[in-house]
C-alpha cells in the first residue's frame, strides 16, 4: 500500500516535482495504442519508440529537469542501460484533467528547448482531437489539428503516418 500512496503524491527528480499520473481507462488505452502503433511502424528502422516509463532530460539555463512523456521517439543509438533520453525527435503527451496544466505549460515550454525535437503531439484521450506542433530547422513551430477519425497524422520526421482510427481504437467518447 505504501508504493500506491507514494504514486498518488509527487514524483521528484533533481529538485523538480512532477504530478504523479492518475490516468483514466481512455488515457491508458490511448497510450497503448500510440506506443503500439509507433513500435509497429518503426520496427526494423533506425528510430525507436519509448513509452511513459522512460524519461527525457532537459537542460535549461537554470536547472536540469526530467519529464515522463506518454511516448517519444529517438533516432539515435540508445544504450540498453540508459535511464533517459536527451534527444527525442518526437514527444507525445496525452492530456488529462490532473496533468493538463503542466503538460500544456511547463512541460511544453521545456520540450520546445530541445534542439533535437521536431514534433510534439498533444492528444485528447476522450474524443478525437490531436494537436501537432511541428518544428523546422530554424526552431519555429507550426500547428496542425486533427479531429477526423478518417485522417492520418503525418510524421515525416520519423517516416511514419499515424491513423487516427488506430489511435482512438477502443476509446469510449466522454465529450464531443
Region locations from a protein language model:
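Gly/Pro/Ser/Thr-rich low-complexity, intrinsically disordered segments predominantly at protein N-termini
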Residues: 1-176
